[in-house]
Amino acid sequence: MSSYTAAPLKFPRSLRIIKSADYGVLVHTRNENTFRLTSKYFSINAMKFPEEPGRLRFGITVGKRNAHRSVDRALVKRTLREAARKQAPNLAALLGEQGVGLDVSLRLRVPLKEIPGIDQGVNALKLSLRTDARSLMEALLKRFPKQLAQTRGE
């Protein structure tokens, strides 16, 4: 047996949006501090908080309309959590430099049955979801400094 112990892959409570009221504000507010990003399968609603520098929280929702079975919803949530967890350190560093906080809502925007790979087995589906989630999080990371520059009038 190897003595190697993997670091726990956690998504701590401090990184999560917990209250439904916070989700409501994030999804329904439209102003200069909010923006949206979409990919093939997922969408992001994000809101900047200039008064809370360095704060980063993620909320993940997968509706029954898009993924009927609970096992499928859990798979999509795990995939989104993994993508968010991997980009969180980079995004948190960027937020710290820029002096703002950010709340991000991630959600599945298309029915799972429309995703290529659903009929080829769970591994193909996981690959499709993982690839799209990763590209969406990278787009968030790339776009965020541009959003700040536009807000500040630079």
Predicted regions and their residues:
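Positively charged, solvent-exposed patches that mediate nucleic-acid binding
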Residues: 1-154
